[in-house]
Swiss-Prot record:
Membrane topology (UniProt): Multi-pass membrane protein
One GO process term, biological-process aspect: lipid biosynthetic process
Entries under Pfam families matching the protein: CER1-like_C, FA_hydroxylase
EC numbers, comma separated: 4.1.99.5
Keyword Chaperone: no
Protein name per the record: Very-long-chain aldehyde decarbonylase GL1-1
Function statement: Aldehyde decarbonylase involved in the conversion of aldehydes to alkanes. Core component of a very-long-chain alkane synthesis complex.
Length: 619
């Protein structure tokens, strides 16, 4: 049986090419020099600007909704927005394409609309009257109809498939529903124009006001103070709240109104708990995370790869895209402001086995970690974040990449020694990182070459491999540091650790483990067919086409993870860096020790097996 009439968009298969549907209007505006006030096509420019601002309105509300650092206490549905919902709502703006053509058709059908005055205050009164007398009751009736039988299962069910209401959910509906909504929106404007009081300002004010209220109702954050409705009880029936509309999404048999609960009162569909729940939500309750991954920003471009900037972009692995370039100056200014004033903040969350996991960001960028004068400030930020997590009652804090740099804080040792009474466990996650790298090395490998060999990870990998009788060429100029590591191996295994000081020593070795940056010249020493395993931050650039390059050590989260909707840097969906996964394992296993400082080589296999047992999988 085919799909119901007007239940899917005609341009569903076009992807981003759907925006070509704007081309006739844009082309007409350009050809008619619509930017000139005297142009007969000036109305086209105003129309396109209006719809551009409409799209921006929903985007700004989406950004607000996903600013967990500012809104998490007043979130109504506490779950995160997962990849499934993001994908379903990817084309949320389809209704704008439909409605811009509906509006253009109206302008062509009624040429007098092209010459509206800029402002007429009387039109506002007419539009307000018709909104209350026509749009609100008609929407209420239509909405209730869409909740019955065939109309719900074939049309409105799509809108209600969103587990967590979001501003983009407001636009996520079928063509039939958007045609009805577009017609209802037009009633007040048409009435004002018919009465001779239409204006450009009225069109902008009414349409943008309509969009703001729709986005607000779906934002999943309570924006009204509870005391407002106690002080002015009549407002309860004149304006809905995000909590009020979220109840409709959860119960589906109550709170059908467009913006005015008065019509639910008249229709007998007003949920009695709406205002009590609104009061409770507006008071704000902070949910305590049990696991915190303390990340940092990589660079200015990557700072845009977060849900509160562009949700859909954050749901895909990071890569520099052309549309980001105009945003770079703004992102650079934000970087300066964060450097000056910001503290660690929440960027995203998910749930695993019913427990809340949060990602916090230290407001520092990759280059900051290489500035000597910035060291104390970074450590202070990390320390405050750990103390905050400890005070909240979190169980584990895992340090990302540069936040656990040996030269910065000894892999977290600084904080554990300074605060011996910490209840939260501090974890660098390097034990699992080492395990991931080691398990990537093919069985039967007899020789490897390693840079960064005397680092924390390099030491652990070298000692583990020599126990397996794998010859490890450790690239280091420091004989003292090499010998210190070699002495940690048992006498019968020390022979497998070999110090080398030149890259040419590895010209016949096809397994390179990279813990220190490699230039193109240095990479040329690798023979064809070499695979570069990496634990260097940032990862090296793959210059050799006849070689393969691994990504940073990572693992896939268990299948039962919920509410995960953002990719971790350039990793695939559901995949996190090994240091993140190491913290998760530490939490799930209930380990009571801090994992800081040197890696315990004896625990590498223990942690690896625990990760697999809990459902984490190698990539």
């Amino acid at each position: 049986m085919g799909a119901a009439f007007l239940s899917s968009w005609p341009w569903d298969n076009l992807g981003a090419y759907k925006y070509v549907l704007y081309a006739p209007l844009v082309g007409k505006a350009v050809a008619g020099r619509a930017w000139e006030r005297a142009s007969p096509d000036h109305w086209l420019l105003l129309l396109l600007v209006l719809f551009g601002v409409r799209a921006l309105t929903y985007q700004l509300w989406s950004s607000f909704s996903n600013m967990l650092f500012a809104t998490r206490r007043r979130r109504i549905v506490r779950d995160g927005v997962d990849f499934g919902q993001i994908d379903r709502e990817w084309d949320w703006d389809n209704f704008l394409i439909l409605q811009v053509h509906m509006a253009a058709a109206a302008f062509y059908a009624f040429p007098s609309l092209r010459h509206l005055p800029l402002w007429d205050a009387r039109g506002l009164a007419v539009a307000a009257l018709l909104h209350v007398a026509a749009t609100e009751p008609l929407f209420y009736a239509a909405h209730r109809a869409f909740h019955r039988g065939h109309l719900f299962s074939c049309y409105h069910l799509q809108h209600h498939s969103a587990k967590v209401p979001q501003p983009f959910t407001a636009g996520f509906a079928t063509p039939l529903e958007q045609l009805v909504l577009g017609a209802l929106m037009a009633v007040p404007l048409a009435a004002a124009c018919a009465a001779g009081h239409g204006s450009v300002a009225l069109a902008f004010a009414y349409v943008l006001g309509f969009d703001n209220l729709r986005a607000m109702g779906h934002c999943n954050v309570e924006v009204f103070p509870g005391g407002l409705f106690q002080s002015l009880p009549v407002l309860k029936y004149l304006i809905y709240t995000p909590t009020y509309h979220t109840i409709h999404h959860t119960k589906e048999d109550a709170n059908f109104c467009l913006f005015m609960p008065l019509f639910d009162l008249i229709g007998g569909t007003l949920d009695a708990q709406s205002w009590e729940m609104q009061k409770k939500t507006s008071a704000g309750v902070d949910e305590v995370p049990e696991f915190v991954f303390l990340a940092h920003v990589v660079d200015v471009m990557q700072s845009l790869h977060v849900p509160f900037v562009l949700r859909t972009f954050a749901s895909t692995p990071f890569s520099v895209q052309p549309f980001l370039l105009p945003m770079w100056p703004f992102a650079f200014l934000v970087m300066l402001m964060m450097w000056a004033w910001s503290k660690t903040f929440v960027i995203s969350c998910y749930r695993l086995r019913g427990r809340l996991h949060q990602m916090w960001a230290v407001p520092r960028y990759g280059f900051h970690y290489f500035l000597p004068f910035a060291k104390d400030g970074i450590n202070n930020q990390i320390e405050l974040a750990i103390l905050r997590a400890d005070k909240m009652g979190a169980k584990v804090v895992s340090l990302a990449a540069l936040n656990k740099n040996e030269a910065l804080n000894g892999g977290g040792t600084l904080f554990v020694n300074k605060h011996p009474g910490l209840r939260v466990r501090v974890v660098h996650g390097n034990t699992l990182t080492a395990a991931v790298i080691l398990n990537e090395i093919p069985q039967g490998t007899t020789e490897v070459f390693m840079t960064g060999a005397t680092s924390k990870l390099g030491r652990a990998i070298a000692l583990y491999l020599c126990r397996k009788k794998v010859r490890v060429m450790m690239m280091t100029l420091s004989t003292e540091r090499f010998q210190k590591i070699q002495r940690e191996a048992t006498p019968e295994h020390q022979q497998y650790l070999v110090q080398v000081t030149k890259y040419r020593s590895a010209q016949h070795c096809k397994t390179w483990i990279v813990g220190k940056w490699l230039s193109p010249r240095e990479q040329r020493w690798a023979p064809p067919g070499t695979h570069f395993h990496q634990f260097v931050v940032p990862p090296i650039i793959g210059f050799r086409r006849d070689c393969t390059y691994g990504k940073l050590a990572a693992m896939r989260l268990p299948k039962d993870v919920q509410g995960l909707g953002a990719c971790e840097y350039s990793l695939e969906r559901g995949v996190v860096h090994a240091c993140h996964a190491g913290g998760v394992v530490h939490f799930l296993e209930g380990y009571t020790h801090h994992e800081v400082g040197a890696i315990d080589v004896d625990r590498i296999d223990v942690v690896w097996e625990a990760a697999l047992r809990h459902g984490l999988r190698p990539v």
